[in-house]
């Protein structure tokens, strides 16, 4: 199978044990430069809060810095968790980004808080209900449009006026897929950590897709699917490096709060269920190519967005390089 669909990167700005948030951010910017040189299509930053191992909290600031050190790659949010933000502020922030960096900015929007309940309450700014979410998107599009004025209020956002920042809907379930389809917007599926509803979510998105919605901006359904990827020179080395992510998800389930851990002997995970990490491509370039081929054939995805965790930033960058070699 000829791999021809765009390939992108989702970065959560990991903080390895013994390092700092500053070092994690610096490593992410170096990876951004590399991805740009290698021809990746997008670089998106996630939004997470109250986590010791991730520094992707102020997403718009990370986007601005990454855009300033790159030239061609699209840079955006994967995504802004809208319940945490006033929609007007989102319009003003991403309008400013578009003014600073031109037509390379994407705005991915999600309904989840991206954190625990206590932190979500501290951050809460808008409703996560589907109807409110749809209205916020409608207003954001208007703030990015010719008038710069929302549909639901006469408030003007001059900094976002005319910027036409593309909006994506993020989701991990059939419900999220249905919302994206009904809104007539591209859909980014979080299959890299939520594998259970992949096939149904993609089907529902395509079946519910409508170009008649006032929010519709594309003519045909567009799916970007997430997948964990670690490429190394050998299958054995890739499996060893993958244990960093496996430990992270074990920590998540156990409620253990610590930074990203170094790899361990893969035998510690022998026979264990992949669980949330089922959608992963791990191995040598030849192995990963076959796994990606299979995933693209299964999903019919129009684009892949890859997530790579590694304790050592050099290992992550080597994976990004090897993946580019087999893809481009």
Predicted regions and their residues:
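N-terminal beta1-alpha1-beta2 module of alpha/beta enzyme domains
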Residues: 1-73
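Flexible, glycine-rich active-site loops centered on histidine and acidic residues
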Residues: 2-21, 83-147, 187, 195
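Conserved, mostly hydrophobic/aromatic
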Residues: 7, 35, 39, 47, ...
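Hydrophobic faces of well-ordered beta-strands that scaffold small-molecule active sites
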Residues: 7-11, 43-45, 75-77, 105-109, ...
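Active-site mouth loops of central-metabolism enzymes
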Residues: 11-26, 80-88, 161-171, 232, ...
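Acidic (Asp/Glu)-rich catalytic clusters
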Residues: 2-3, 36, 63-72, 98-105, ...
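A conserved active-site cap/scaffold subdomain adjacent to cofactor or substrate pockets
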Residues: 175-196, 201-202
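An alpha-helical appendage that flanks or caps ligand/catalytic pockets
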Residues: 127-156, 197-302
């Amino acid at each position: 199978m000829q791999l021809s669909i765009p390939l992108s990167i989702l970065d959560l700005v990991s903080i390895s044990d013994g390092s700092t948030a500053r070092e994690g951010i610096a490593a992410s910017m170096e990876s951004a430069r590399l991805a740009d040189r290698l021809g990746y299509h997008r670089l998106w930053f996630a939004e997470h809060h109250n986590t010791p191992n991730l520094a992707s909290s102020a997403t718009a600031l990370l986007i601005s810095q990454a855009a300033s050190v790159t030239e061609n790659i699209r840079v955006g949010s994967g995504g802004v968790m809208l319940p945490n933000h006033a929609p007007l502020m989102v319009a003003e922030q991403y309008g400013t980004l578009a003014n600073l960096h031109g037509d390379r900015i994407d705005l991915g929007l999600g309904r989840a808080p991206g954190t625990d309940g206590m932190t979500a309450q501290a951050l809460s700014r808008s409703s996560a209900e589907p109807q409110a979410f749809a209205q916020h998107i409608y207003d954001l599009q208007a703030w990015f449009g010719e008038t710069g004025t929302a549909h639901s209020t006469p408030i003007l956002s001059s900094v976002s006026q005319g910027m036409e920042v593309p909006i994506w809907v993020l989701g991990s379930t059939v419900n999220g897929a249905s919302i994206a389809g009904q809104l007539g917007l591209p859909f980014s599926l979080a299959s890299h950590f939520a594998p259970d509803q992949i096939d149904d979510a993609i089907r529902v998105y395509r079946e519910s897709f409508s170009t008649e919605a006032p929010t519709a901006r594309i003519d045909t359904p567009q799916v970007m699917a997430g997948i964990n990827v670690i490429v190394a020179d050998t299958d054995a080395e890739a499996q060893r490096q993958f244990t960093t992510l496996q430990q992270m998800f074990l920590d998540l389930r156990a409620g253990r709060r610590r930074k990203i851990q170094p790899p361990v002997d893969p035998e510690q995970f022998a026979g264990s269920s992949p669980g949330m990490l089922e959608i992963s491509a791990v191995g040598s370039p030849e192995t990963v190519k076959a796994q990606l081929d299979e995933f693209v054939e299964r999903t019919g995805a129009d684009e892949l967005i890859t997530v790579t965790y590694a304790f050592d930033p050099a290992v992550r960058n080597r994976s990004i390089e090897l993946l580019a070699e087999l893809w481009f």
